[in-house]
Amino acid sequence: AFDLNDFNTLEDTYDQMNVFQLSEAGLTHEGRDMKSWIDSLTHCRSHLDEDVFMFKRNEPDSGSACVGTDLNRSSNNPCSDTYGGSGPASALETRHSYSQQYEDELNQRQRYEPSGTTVNNLLNKDAGSIYSYTPELR
């Protein structure tokens, strides 16, 4: 049986994961299944900066006169400020949001900024941002 306070076998872990809708991403070099799920109900940590207002993304919703999807919300009403989209990961941004990269409209390829550069300082220290990482699975 799966126990959060103990080391669990791979089989027990996979059995516990069956409560989720799983996707298979292929095989490891050992021939084991790589299983994953999308956790789309993680709270957005809006308390980190009370001066920032999060706007809905500005893409028109098909079949509706309303515009916008809030990637961190789950309303089914397309005209609501908390409309979460037509389904899980329906917005392209949710498929990219796993990473710790800065991207602007000029990026044509993946690029990393070395520590101490203006961009790195702006995004971290100079902006006074708090680094937050939310996976809570043990």
Curated annotation (Swiss-Prot):
Broad class of the protein's primary localization: secreted
Subcellular localization(s) per the UniProt record: Secreted
GO cellular component: extracellular region
Documented activity regulation: Completely inhibited by the A-type carboxypeptidase inhibitor benzylsuccinic acid. Inhibited by the leech carboxypeptidase inhibitor and the potato carboxidase inhibitor. Inhibited by the chelating agent 1,10-phenanthroline. Partial inhibition by preincubation with the chelating agent EDTA is reversed by addition of Zn(2+).
Enzyme class: hydrolase
Residue pairs linked by disulfide bridges in the UniProt entry: C66-C79
Active site positions: E136
Note on how the cofactor is bound: Binds 1 zinc ion per subunit.
GO MF annotation list: carboxypeptidase activity; metallocarboxypeptidase activity; metallopeptidase activity; zinc ion binding
pH-dependent activity: Optimum pH is 7.0-7.5 with AAFP as substrate.
Keywords: Carboxypeptidase, Disulfide bond, Hydrolase, Metal-binding, Metalloprotease, Protease, Secreted, Zinc
Record carries keyword Protease: yes
Annotated Zn(2+) binding sites: H43, H96
Sequence segments annotated as region (Disordered): 61-123
Function: Carboxypeptidase that catalyzes the release of hydrophobic and acidic C-terminal amino acids.
Protein name as it appears in the record: Carboxypeptidase
Organism: Sabellastarte magnifica
